[in-house]
Amino acid sequence: MKKSTWKTYAFWILFTEAVGALSGWLTRTGTQIYNETIIQPPLSPPAIVFPIVWGILFALMGIGAARIYLAPTSGARSRSLLLFLIQLIFNFFWSIIFFNFQAYGFAFVWLVALWALIILMIVKFNETDRIAALLQIPYLLWVTFAAYLNLGIFILN
């Protein structure tokens, strides 16, 4: 791997992980309240699962973004990176809406919008780099599961 390629991967992975870490840090109090007081739907995993899964997913997102960034310059590449950044912003704010504001209904609507953005991102990634697109499938599946949990929490609480 070329040094510039290595730096590109490192940047995108670290950037994406940093966004996730900042979101986690900003919601640490809300997360604690959530874990102690919220009625959770069936199939809710233990709290320790979430940071592990998100750490892996943010790394996969970063790898995918790096692959797109390293692709030849094109309109599809630019649109892919823009969608990546937009969905990352939506991802970042979902945690704040859900954990800090405890606005579970609005958080669900926000999450559905994030889900749609992830699908659009996968479609756009696929136009430039199929592997980058495939790397986003676990993210889409996890957000689908998160939507189930979010809706269940909204209904139960």
Residue ranges of predicted features:
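Membrane-interfacial loop-to-transmembrane alpha-helix junctions, especially the N-terminal start
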Residues: 75-84
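Membrane-interface helix termini and inter-helical loops of multi-pass transporters
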Residues: 29-43, 156
